[in-house]
Amino acid sequence: MEQEICVIGFSGGQDSTTLAVWAKKRFKKVCLVGFDYAQKHSVELECAQKIASLLQLPYEIIPLDFLENITHSALFKNSNDLMGHSHAQNKDLPNSFVPNRNAIFITLLHSYAQKLGASNIALGVSQADFSGYPDCKEDFIKSIEHALNLGSNTAIKIVTPLMFLSKAQEFQMAKDLGVLDLIIKETHTCYQGERKILHAYGYGCDKCPACQLRKKGFEEFQAML
């Protein structure tokens, strides 16, 4: 186990929960940080709080509800846009994309890491099985790590152990870590905030892009067994 502190961007979803369990086994102290950005699926914050308690890890929520006032996304509570279409600001991106969201998240995590004296920030981003978001790619993560360290005269590392894992491989990782049941029953991925129906892969509407990606990954995981 590394004798260092690690700050995790934590949504209460499959990726960040798997990441939190992984980090807990590797770092002396792990701190979870969530963001309330007026997302439709704000139920994820409730799930994150419960998971943090189950994992016995400290959890902070940073309010960022101003985001919906400065940019567009179908993920915002007040948006009437239906998922599955092109973004109003960039036709090459899905409308669930929140421009600069990860840049803002990572900047705040970097600041918080400095306050705690943390040497590491861990993110559950993946470019192997993602939703078409450019701010989940390795080149972006490496670039912002370099820029933030230059701007703060620091050497904080951003670790992304899920970067090249598919959703199926993430389910396998959760199984290997002994938390597959936790991932299925407690984490939240659905963009519509659906928590009434438990599918084999977890709760969700079974229709939005996030549910479809998770469902596909679980089916591929089952085929691997």
UniProtKB/Swiss-Prot annotation:
Pathway membership: Purine metabolism; 7-cyano-7-deazaguanine biosynthesis
Cofactor info, note text: Binds 1 zinc ion per subunit.
First-tier enzyme category under EC: ligase
Pfam families: QueC
Transmembrane regions listed in the UniProt entry: none
Keywords of this entry: ATP-binding, Ligase, Metal-binding, Nucleotide-binding, Queuosine biosynthesis, Zinc
Gene3D superfamilies assigned: HUPs (3.40.50.620)
InterPro entries listed in its UniProt record: QueC, Rossmann-like_a/b/a_fold
GO terms of biological process kind: queuosine biosynthetic process
UniProt-recorded Gene Ontology molecular function terms: ATP binding; ligase activity, forming carbon-nitrogen bonds; zinc ion binding
Catalytic activity, EC: 6.3.4.20
Annotated residues for binding of Zn(2+): C190, C205, C208, C211
Protein family (similarity comment): Belongs to the QueC family.
NCBIfam families: 7-cyano-7-deazaguanine synthase QueC
Name the UniProt record assigns to this protein: 7-cyano-7-deazaguanine synthase
